[in-house]
């Protein structure tokens, strides 16, 4: 399978490349810099230069790689998870997640139905009995901060679910 990973140099993207290569998939990694190209090449992926916030460059990357699956692990989280750094990174992280997701989904595919896996979140589930699964509701009636996070992830999933030609999987971890 031909797999394109957006967010390939992050904490999840790097081991994901290794796992996919071990299973003999052809792996492409969306990168913005020569340093990132070097990292993903060392891991066995083919770098594809594009900026997730630039729809034209994302379209060109999709056209070039013709993936059967796109895995969206895009974030813009700080190196250290202090309250101050998280606040400082929040606006950019939100932009990367929303616009990057939209650009990846908007790129037309001519490879038939494409699988689209999106990093979602399990942190925003509504309380319930037993284990939660992908059908569990987000906590929309929680505190303002939790409800905002829940709405954000629900919106990302809804956009993917509404995209024609996409077999969507929300990765809630």
Spans of features found by a protein language model:
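Rossmann-fold NAD(P)-dependent oxidoreductase module
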Residues: 15, 19, 107, 159
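Conserved hydrophobic beta-strands of the Rossmann-like cofactor-binding core
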Residues: 3-5, 70-71, 116
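Conserved beta-strand positions in the Rossmann-like core of class I SAM-dependent methyltransferases
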Residues: 28, 48, 169
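N-terminal Rossmann NAD(P)H-binding glycine-rich loop of SDR-like oxidoreductase domains
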Residues: 3-25
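Conserved Rossmann-fold NAD(P)-dependent oxidoreductase catalytic core, especially the SDR/UDP-sugar
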Residues: 80-147
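Conserved beta-loop-beta element that borders a ligand/cofactor-binding pocket
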Residues: 115, 120-121, 157-173
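NAD(P)H-binding glycine-rich loop region in Rossmannoid oxidoreductase-like domains
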Residues: 34-41, 45-103
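Conserved glycine-rich Rossmann-like NAD(P)H-binding loop of the short-chain dehydrogenase/reductase
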Residues: 25-32
């Amino acid at each position: 399978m031909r797999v394109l990973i957006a967010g390939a140099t992050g904490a999840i993207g790097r081991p994901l490349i290794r796992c996919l290569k071990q299973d003999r998939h052809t792996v492409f990694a969306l990168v913005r810099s020569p340093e990132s190209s070097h990292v993903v090449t060392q891991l066995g992926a083919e770098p594809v230069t594009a900026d997730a916030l630039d729809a034209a460059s994302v379209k060109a990357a999709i056209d070039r790689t013709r993936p059967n699956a796109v895995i969206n692990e895009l974030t813009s989280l700080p190196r250290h998870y202090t309250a101050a750094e998280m606040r400082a990174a929040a606006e950019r992280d939100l932009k990367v997640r929303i616009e990057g997701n939209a650009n990846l989904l908007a790129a037309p595919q001519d490879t038939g139905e494409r699988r689209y896996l999106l990093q979602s979140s399990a942190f925003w589930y509504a309380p319930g009995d037993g284990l939660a699964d992908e059908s569990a509701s987000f906590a929309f009636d929680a505190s303002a901060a939790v409800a905002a996070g829940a709405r954000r992830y629900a919106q990302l999933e809804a956009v993917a679910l509404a995209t024609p030609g996409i077999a969507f999987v929300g990765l809630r971890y």
